C-alpha cells in the first residue's frame, strides 16, 4: 500500500512539473496597439511571441473589441493585402513578431476608441499552452513600435496604395 502511494505521489509530482514547464513555454513581450483616430472602429494589436518548445497561436479575444482575429498583411504586386489566418506557427526557440505590415491581431467593432497611454486586456489562445492574458499598451496614432515612435510611412512601402481585405 505504501509503495502504491509513493508511486502515485511521484507520478503526480511529475505531472505537476510537466504542467508547470508547459506554462512557462510561452513568452509574450512588447504588447502594444496604435491609438485610433476619431470614429475608427478597427485597430490592430502587436506583440513578440516566443515558444521554447514550439506552439501555434490559434486565436485571440479582448473586451476592447467585439471581434479579434489573427491577420497577415502581404504585398501582392502593388497592392497591400490583408487576410485572416487560422493561426501562426511558433517554431521552437524563435521569436515571432506581430507588427505593422505583417502578422497582427485585428480588432473590429471597438468598444471605445483606443487612446494613447490606455491599456487593455488581450487573451491569446495557443494550441499547446492554452490561453494567456496580456496587457496591451496603446501608443500614439501612427506608431511603428511599442515605444510609440510615429513613422512617415517610408518603412512600409505600398501603404498609400489600395488595400484589399
What are the language-model segments listed below?
Residues 5, 19-21:
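Short, surface-exposed loop and linker segments with low hydrophobicity and enrichment for Pro/Ser/Thr
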Residues 1-8:
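Bacterial N-terminal signal peptides that target proteins for export
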Residues 23-165:
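Compact, glycine-rich, soluble single-domain proteins
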Amino acid at each position: 500500500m505504501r509503495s502504491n502511494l509513493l508511486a502515485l505521489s511521484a507520478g503526480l509530482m511529475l505531472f505537476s512539473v510537466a504542467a508547470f514547464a508547459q506554462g512557462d513555454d510561452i513568452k509574450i513581450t512588447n504588447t502594444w496597439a496604435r491609438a485610433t483616430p476619431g470614429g475608427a472602429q478597427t485597430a490592430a494589436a502587436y506583440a513578440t511571441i516566443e515558444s521554447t518548445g514550439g506552439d501555434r497561436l490559434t486565436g485571440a479575444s479582448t473586451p476592447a473589441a467585439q471581434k479579434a482575429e489573427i491577420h497577415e498583411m502581404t504585398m501582392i504586386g502593388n497592392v497591400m493585402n490583408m487576410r485572416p489566418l487560422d493561426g501562426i506557427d511558433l517554431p521552437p526557440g524563435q521569436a515571432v513578431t506581430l507588427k505593422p505590415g505583417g502578422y497582427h491581431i485585428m480588432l473590429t467593432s471597438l468598444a471605445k476608441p483606443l487612446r494613447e497611454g490606455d491599456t487593455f486586456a488581450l487573451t491569446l489562445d495557443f494550441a499547446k499552452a492554452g490561453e494567456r492574458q496580456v496587457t496591451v499598451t496603446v501608443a500614439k496614432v501612427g506608431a511603428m513600435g511599442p515605444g510609440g515612435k510615429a513613422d512617415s510611412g517610408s518603412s512600409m512601402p505600398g501603404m498609400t496604395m489600395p488595400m484589399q481585405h
